[in-house]
């Protein structure tokens, strides 16, 4: 049974041609190493990792070696060690983690589901677990869903798709074409297309074939997610500016309105980086937008009644330090009345191929339409100053022209890859809805039209962190909520504040609301504006940490918002307290999502994992593990630094996240050794995979002396500041007996100790970033 299976003549020859992802910025090869494959009749097994095996079955004996919507890469760096064997009836494959048993000559998936033809056995926390195709799992930890449109409280929980991890210890990716995704679409193959210059959908070789990926990672959740991104593609690093504040509102703003908004933002000292122009930028048929009954949800031409000189306005927005995105609802195609010049250009170029009754239908399924559309319309607006696009797809979920082609996923794929190919001067990014597994490759998510109330806010922390279970790491929400059913709460200052405070600790920081004059989203109009602004400034202060964690997401596949059970999988509390999450490696967040008591105080029950946690808002050290109920005023946010952490932050005066960081802060929690880091690049470069720099921080403890080290910057520092000053804030500190920088003792007047807040502040003079700095504090 242990004889190597290759020698038994069962392995078939691979097809000579093994297609690769020719146009992806990151090299991918969807064809696995032949050494990883075991073929038995009409069944093929591919051992991808010790915990992951691909299982294919085709009545025709046809296997798929192209990429699919979900899977991009099967050529792993190393073929994992495994052994094979057989007897008269069964094939056996054994890895370090899995034992597979297959009845030769059968379809692995029986009807109804049973363990008759295929089982995989694994050890999960000391207990054997047996899986077979079709086995149900009620302990899956879920992933995400297409949209929060209509979200009221947690009514969208039931729509959340299965994730890639489970308390059961196993999960399955069913990438079979015949199995519908949540939106009714299917996972097509992808292959290079010479017309558009990137990968295009293609029918599967055998649409009825079985194509499963068994993932038996136990409770090593982070490894499961990380290995998923190895086969499904990395999560691209968004440009730095997307982590700033976005001003966004669905409203009939004129050019002068946008100018006034920018003046008010500047006058009120509000940091901001992105300006969204929602659908009133184009003719949309609304009387309120002076559209003269021209257009509708779909539009491509500027509403010159509102914005008479678009290029001039976009230049002014850029000159004020903003990036610009336009909202698109493209489903209705190109109309000869709404966009006559675009219609005529495309009709001529395509020889009227897609014309019907004065309209070119939305044929994004086809390369010739797509090439003409981007050439004639999208390039034109980008030349005017549009930086990226918001794909607000709300129409039919699957294509009326190609059966099973998901419109959400396909729009995302095409817009993103067009930007990769045709806008090489900037980092590709689009703002879009979840379209199923593989959507993480198009990185920034727009969750949609959630209702304005506290229960909906309470659902979003769970929803955001849980999306990391499918690699969807960059959800952005309508902070403040989108629409309302209760007018009494529509502009509730406390609700708006708590939503914005939650948004500080989410990937994308964007307030938004629907076109209703009763809803206010200009934070300077709220009576608690100073608290709202403080939250925005906290977001900007955290940017160096946030961007560092975004890079970690690219490197590891782990989202910056992550469930507690990633770190504490065997603690029941990590599953129970689903409104808490980790924001990166070192910050625990428990947002306030309920209204305060009559005394204005919010009381929050919080689980603290093992270790000590510094409460930034209240200035106290909390010893975990424990459950505590803490009080928070409305200007306080429950977030906690891990003891030993070293967290890089901006000065509170920063107004743009891309401003040169000539001075930074390190917040370090005294008492325990730890590490931290700072990631830097030029912010919008496409070669960030290799062109970047990092600075390591270490925190050592020896007796009553604590040593904080800023290592020399490593990597490519082209375009980055060469010299920098630092402020080291040591939290939970006693008053020191002595402080030294690089061996030189400081006078007591050269450092500051705040006894009330237990904070020691040491200012480190401007230093070359290539030089190490060491601070020793003796207590």
PLM feature segments, named:
Residues 114, 123, 131-133, 271-532, ...:
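Aromatic- and carboxylate-enriched substrate-binding clefts and catalytic-loop regions
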Residues 153-154, 238-241, 248-287, 295, ...:
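A conserved hydrophobic secondary-structure block that centers on an alpha-helix together
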Residues 1-30:
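Bacterial Sec-dependent N-terminal signal peptides
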Residues 45, 53-55, 93-100, 588-591, ...:
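Short, well-ordered beta-strand segments enriched in hydrophobic/aromatic residues
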Residues 81-84, 742-770:
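Extracellular/luminal ectodomains and secreted, surface-exposed scaffolds of diverse proteins
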Residues 49-88:
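A low-complexity, Ser/Thr/Gly/Pro-enriched, surface-exposed linker/loop concept
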Residues 417, 438-445, 459-460, 467-477, ...:
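Catalytic core of carbohydrate-active enzymes
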Residues 84-239, 249, 255, 262-267, ...:
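Catalytic and substrate-binding clefts that recognize carbohydrates or anionic sugar/phosphate headgroups
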């Amino acid at each position: 049974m242990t004889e190597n299976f290759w020698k038994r003549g069962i392995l078939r020859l691979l097809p000579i041609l093994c297609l690769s992802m020719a146009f992806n910025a990151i090299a991918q090869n969807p064809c696995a190493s032949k050494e990883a494959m075991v073929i038995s009749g009409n069944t093929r097994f591919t051992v991808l990792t010790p915990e992951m095996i691909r299982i294919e079955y085709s009545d025709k004996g046809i296997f798929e070696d192209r990429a699919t919507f979900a899977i991009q890469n099967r050529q792993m760096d190393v073929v994992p060690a495994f052994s094979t064997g057989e007897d008269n009836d069964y094939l056996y494959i054994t890895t370090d983690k899995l034992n597979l048993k297959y009845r030769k000559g059968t379809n692995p998936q029986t009807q109804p589901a049973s363990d008759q033809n295929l089982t995989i056995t694994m050890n999960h926390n000391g207990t054997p677990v047996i899986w077979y195709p079709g086995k149900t799992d009620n302990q899956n930890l879920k992933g995400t869903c297409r949209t929060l449109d209509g979200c009221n409280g947690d009514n969208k929980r039931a729509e959340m798709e299965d994730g890639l991890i489970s308390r059961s210890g196993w999960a399955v990716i069913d990438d079979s074409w015949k199995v519908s995704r949540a939106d009714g679409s299917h996972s097509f193959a992808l292959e290079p297309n010479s017309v558009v210059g990137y990968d295009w959908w293609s029918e599967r070789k055998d649409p009825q074939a079985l194509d499963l990926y068994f993932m038996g990672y136990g409770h090593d959740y982070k490894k499961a997610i990380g290995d998923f991104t190895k086969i499904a593609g990395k999560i691209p690093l968004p440009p730095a500016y997307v982590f700033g504040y976005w001003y966004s509102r669905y409203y009939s703003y004129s050019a002068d309105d946008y100018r006034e908004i920018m003046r008010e933002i500047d006058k009120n000292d509000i940091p901001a980086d992105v300006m969204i122009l929602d659908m009133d930028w184009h003719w949309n048929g609304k009387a309120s937008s002076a559209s003269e009954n021209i257009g509708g949800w779909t539009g491509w031409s500027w509403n010159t009644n509102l914005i008479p000189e678009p290029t001039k306005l976009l230049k002014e927005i850029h000159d004020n330090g903003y990036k610009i995105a336009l909202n698109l609802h493209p489903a209705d195609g190109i109309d000869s009345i709404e966009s006559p010049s675009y219609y005529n250009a495309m009709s001529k170029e395509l020889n009227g191929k897609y014309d019907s009754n004065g309209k070119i239908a939305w044929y994004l399924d086809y390369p010739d339409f797509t090439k003409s559309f981007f050439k004639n319309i999208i390039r034109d607006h980008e030349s005017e100053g549009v930086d990226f696009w918001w794909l607000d797809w709300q129409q039919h979920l699957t294509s009326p022209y190609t059966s099973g082609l998901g419109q959400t996923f396909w729009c995302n794929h095409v817009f993103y890859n067009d930007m990769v190919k045709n806008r090489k001067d900037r980092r590709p990014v689009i703002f879009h809805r979840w379209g199923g597994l593989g959507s993480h490759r198009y990185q920034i998510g727009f969750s949609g039209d959630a209702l304005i109330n506290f229960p909906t806010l309470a659902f979003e922390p769970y929803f955001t962190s849980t999306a990391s279970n499918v690699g969807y790491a960059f959800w952005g929400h309508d902070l403040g909520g989108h629409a309302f059913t209760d007018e009494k709460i529509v502009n509730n200052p406390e609700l708006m504040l708590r939503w914005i405070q939650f948004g500080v600790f989410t990937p994308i920081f964007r307030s938004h609301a629907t076109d209703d004059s009763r809803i206010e989203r200009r934070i300077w109009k709220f009576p608690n504006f100073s608290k709202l602004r403080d939250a925005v400034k906290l977001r900007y202060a955290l940017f160096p940490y946030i961007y560092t964690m975004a890079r970690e997401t690219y490197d590891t596949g782990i989202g910056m918002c992550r469930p507690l059970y990633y770190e504490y999988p065997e603690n029941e509390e990590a599953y129970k307290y689903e409104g808490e999450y980790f924001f990166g490696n070192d910050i625990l967040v428990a947002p306030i999502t309920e209204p305060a008591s009559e005394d204005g105080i919010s009381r929050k029950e919080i689980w603290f994992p093992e270790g000590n946690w510094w409460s930034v808002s209240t200035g106290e050290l909390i010893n975990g593990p424990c459950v505590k109920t803490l009080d928070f005023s409305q200007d306080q946010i429950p977030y906690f630094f891990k003891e030993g952490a070293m967290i890089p932050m901006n000065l509170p005066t920063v107004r743009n996240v891309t401003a040169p960081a000539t001075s930074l802060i390190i917040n370090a929690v005294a008492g325990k050794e730890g590490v931290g880091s700072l990631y830097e690049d030029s912010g919008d470069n496409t070669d960030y995979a290799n062109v970047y720099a990092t600075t390591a921080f270490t925190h050592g403890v020896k007796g009553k002396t604590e040593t904080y080290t800023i290592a020399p910057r490593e990597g490519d520092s082209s375009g980055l500041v060469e010299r920098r000053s630092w402020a080291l804030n040591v939290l939970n500190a006693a008053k020191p007996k002595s402080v030294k920088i690089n061996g030189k003792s400081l006078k007591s007047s050269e450092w500051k100790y705040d006894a009330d807040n237990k904070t020691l502040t040491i200012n480190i003079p401007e230093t070359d970033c290539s030089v190490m700095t060491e601070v020793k504090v003796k207590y």
